[in-house]
Each structure stands twice: as C-alpha cells, then as structure tokens.
Amino acid sequence: MATTVAATKLTSLKAVKKLGFREIRQVRQWSPLQSAMPHFGMLRCGSRQSFATSTVVKAQATAVEQSTGEAVPKVESPVVVVTGASRGIGKAIALSLGKAGCKVLVNYARSAKEAEEVSKQIEAYGGQAITFGGDVSKEADVEAMMKTAIDAWGTIDVVVNNAGITRDTLLIRMKKSQWDEVIDLNLTGVFLCTQAATKIMMKKRKGRIINIASVVGLIGNIGQANYAAAKAGVIGFSKTAAREGASRNINVNVVCPGFIASDMTAKLGEDMEKKILGTIPLGRYGQPEDVAGLVEFLALSPAASYITGQAFTIDGGIAI
C-alpha cells in the first residue's frame, strides 16, 4: 500500500513539472463613435509554446507540495502590454488578462485616473499591473513603454494593440489633418508597437500579438474613409507580420469587432438603436467582454498556438 501511494505522488509531481507554460482557460465588441452618427465608428474592428495561468499552476503545485513536501519550480505569469486600456474594449481586455494571471501594462493617452482604476482592479484579482501614459503613434513613447514593461518584469510575452480614434466626416469634407490623425494612431501606432514587440519576441523565439481592427476595415462605412483605411491596413499589415514572425514562433492575429455596447450607444435614442440593431443578424450589441474573451483565447490558450495571420470578426453577423 505504501509503495502504491508513493508511486502516485511521484507521478503527480512529474505531471505538474511537465506543465511548463500550459494554460487551461476558456474563451469568454464595435466601439462607439465619437459622434452621434449611426455608423461603424461604433464598430471597433478593434506561440506554439503556450503561456500558463498562474492560478492553475499554483493550485496543482500546492496539491503536490502538500502530499510530497517538495517544492515545485515556479511558473512565471505572462507579461502583457495592452494599449488604449483605460476604458471600453481595452479596459475589458486588460481586466480579462489580469484576471487570468497575467502581469499587465495598462497604456493610456489621457485618462490617467481611469487607467489607475483598471490597474487597481487587476491587483484586486491578485494580479500585477502598472500604468503607462504615452502616445503610441510616437516612436519614443513606444520604446519607453516597452522598456517600462521589461524593467518591471524582465520580458514581454503578449502585446494587444487596441488604441484608436475616430475623426468622422464624409470623404469630400474630410481634412487632411483628420486623415492624418486617424492613420497615425490607428495604423502607424500598430506598426510601431508590433515592430518593437517583435524585436523582443524574436530573441526569445516566442510571442503573441493581437491587433484590434474593425469590421469597417472589411466592409467600409459612410463617413469613415480614414478609419476604414486604417483598419484595413491593420489587417494587411498583421498578415505580413504573421508571415515574418512565424519562423520565430510569433503568432499575429486580428480581432474585428462590430457594434459594442458603451456609454455612447446608450445615448443614441430608441429610434436610432432600432435602425442599428436592424443591421445586426443577432439583433443585439456585443459586450466588451465578448471581445476580451476572444483576445484572451488568442493570447493565452494552447489551442490558439496554431492560429496566425487570421482576422476574426466578432460582430453579431454584420459581415456575413
């Protein structure tokens, strides 16, 4: 009997030691326009070696330690950078990844107070978080942001490029400054962050990058020529980055949200809401958590290790 118990304990210990960076998580939003127009600015089409959720590993390691008295090697939590993470979809993504056990850098442009609140929520879940104020369309800010994460935690495993803006107007009225603002942040910002992250990930031969685009980048939308061009650019850019990073085990994917519930959609009024919902086959808005769940899957799940260069719509069926 004693021999059987000892053998069982040894087998359990070996199983836990083999976990490595495995993750056992389940998969769990069109962000509103900056104007009252009922269009797709309300739409945010925002590694083979997998990462582990610390709570899963801790639970199994504790069980083995209690039965054997032996310590199990610590599995480090993934380090994640989320841009535009102080509110909306970005906030939901940061919270989801923080709850999953990640160490999260919460990037913001102007909303310092909101970013601090997100950071505190992550810490309340038992995770770790830091905030960083910076404009991702500026190379110096991006370099400083990545350095902040590395100085704090030693590496970067996942980058989620979510930061974005809208400057909506019809093409014939659009000023070059409105075009430039959207392209600079929504497309050039993704380029700069992806480039900086790839340099880090190539050295470690592992990493995952998720870029938030929009259904608008796939089907277009009246009054959003700048936004549609930027988001379509993100999709094409991501496919190229995926091809270039594949040999170094770097996965790059795109998430394209449709209409996502927000403070802005809540102010549209009943008539406008009916018109919008009439364009959505599922007949309802998505939730920020819907997008966050898909991002979490692509960022952490072992089941996503063979997925790269793909653009996933999460839009209630608008792009069918």
From Swiss-Prot:
Location of the protein in the cell: Plastid, Chloroplast
Pfam entry (one): adh_short
Binding residues annotated for substrate, in chain numbering: 214
Keywords for the protein's UniProt record, in alphabetical order: Chloroplast, Fatty acid biosynthesis, Fatty acid metabolism, Lipid biosynthesis, Lipid metabolism, NADP, Oxidoreductase, Plastid, Transit peptide
Active site per UniProt: 227
Catalyzed reactions: a (3R)-hydroxyacyl-[ACP] + NADP(+) = a 3-oxoacyl-[ACP] + NADPH + H(+)
Pathway: Lipid metabolism; fatty acid biosynthesis
Listed InterPro entries: 3oxo_ACP_reduc (IPR011284), NAD(P)-bd_dom_sf (IPR036291), Sc_DH/Rdtase_CS (IPR020904), SDR (IPR050259), SDR_fam (IPR002347)
Uppermost EC category: oxidoreductase
Binding site for NADP(+): 82-106
GO molecular function, one term: NAD binding
Enzyme Commission designation: 1.1.1.100
Transit peptide: 1-60
Record GO biological process: fatty acid biosynthetic process
Gene Ontology cellular component terms for the protein in this record: chloroplast
Keyword Chloroplast included in the entry's annotation: yes
Oligomer status and interactors: Homotetramer.
Family under the similarity heading: Belongs to the short-chain dehydrogenases/reductases (SDR) family.
Name listed for the protein in its UniProt record: 3-oxoacyl-[acyl-carrier-protein] reductase 1, chloroplastic
Species of the source: Brassica napus
Gene responsible for this protein: gbkr1
